[in-house]
């Protein structure tokens, strides 16, 4: 008999960004205990990892019941990903669209690697629920964000590790406006303000420029999506 989520532990892929912060709140609402995992892979916006502490502290302060559920925070360094990737997320080059139609911010295999490492850690921790912020609605066309990719990987992980992992992607069908709305649904304006102020999305790692939707350069694709989502969210609650 499979235990209900309210009695299980989840491992959340937690970068410090808007999507992963929303997924963390989603998991805290559903599971008995929640651990987090971040990756240092040589990303230009590594400042996102520094945002995690503020987000964790903020969520614990916002909801005492969430504070009791927060477990260990893990960080894995995988510099090899940057060594084998020639992308604008790991090298100091201009962000542009490649001949394939994908932006050069695409890091080949990144989510596949992240979820495989997460599953290996979950295996050791006795955890079968893994939560990620992948989304195929409002995204840059990354093939490893697609639902069919995640479902196929789940099958491979379960076969390769002889486990029954569940890969939860609560944002898969949501655009960025709906992601802001989900944060409001989970934690009210307090959570929305926490994510707006303390999460990081900008590909260039800019934290000096403050906008209505948070910090960022305001020009990169990630900032554009976040800003567009914020405007849509405001229109929905008006």
Curated annotation (Swiss-Prot):
It is an enzyme of class 6 (ligase). ATP binds at residues 14-24. The keyword Ligase applies. One of its GO terms (biological process) is queuosine biosynthetic process. Its EC number is 6.3.4.20. Keywords: ATP-binding, Ligase, Metal-binding, Nucleotide-binding, Queuosine biosynthesis, Zinc. Its cofactor is Zn(2+). The keyword Cell inner membrane does not apply. GO terms for molecular function: ATP binding; ligase activity, forming carbon-nitrogen bonds; zinc ion binding. Pathway: Purine metabolism; 7-cyano-7-deazaguanine biosynthesis. PANTHER family: 7-CYANO-7-DEAZAGUANINE SYNTHASE. Belongs to the QueC family. Catalyzes the ATP-dependent conversion of 7-carboxy-7-deazaguanine (CDG) to 7-cyano-7-deazaguanine (preQ(0)). This is 7-cyano-7-deazaguanine synthase. The gene is queC.
